[in-house]
């Protein structure tokens, strides 16, 4: 492993040797003609995994969300979304620019949810004065936070009662599934009358996939990113019904997302689904190690991580010194992002030694 410790994002990962081998030997065709066997296999694989009829391989998560919103909505429609969600805040206003679909952003509760009462209040009446509310978009995880399953069920049921479609930006869906599987295991172990002694046993692959599917099945469409924690170099998938994916396919073409011998990339994504889901638990453990290592440092508040993202807020004297922190870390081969609010993301190219180096460097800078 390189001596550099890059904690900026889980998008910085390099393909593993096994992933590179899968890419090198992937059978190829022309996906614009629908003839790339590796792309077709990946689309079938992720659709079946999450319980959908079909899926579409796209270059980016931004394009996946754009295809989803424009497939659910028409010009003059709107979608309800959170202020901090990627498809509102970080995607250049694409749905409004390209589709004349306006967002109706809502404030998040501290746990990342959109209050149910706020969602209901945002749904417009059938009146020519208003944009037509067509879609509820959620993100899980959001800023590394796992949305409670009960909330996901309630919010999507509310949307369904009002005739809204439901889309999940599941860029880190499998991080959510790993965290949820461990939470479900803990609840079972702690339940009255339980005789289980497996509270520390690693959850199985089947348990994680079951939780991913459980989350996904609350929605009409789901976007999954392969190039974050799963470690593939490029690509996302959009899952939904066959009719929905046919609409999304047309939008992908208009957005320039059709690729030719894309099986090289699809093979990397398929390898990640087979080999990199379970290891996400290691990233979560490293995030906890980082958070625990910074706990108690004066002027530093650390949010307990749900998954692989750690947020750190600086106060008082630590805040006054914040401008020099990232250069100090960079001089020691450690990269992160932020100023007064720092973000650290663990991934497959970071190990415990790297996390410990980062902790020591931060504590040393602040005199801890």
Predicted regions, residues:
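Intrinsically disordered, low-complexity segments enriched in serine/proline and basic residues
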Residues: 185-189, 194-205
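Conserved PLP-enzyme active-site core in the AAT-like
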Residues: 2-185, 205-350, 358-367
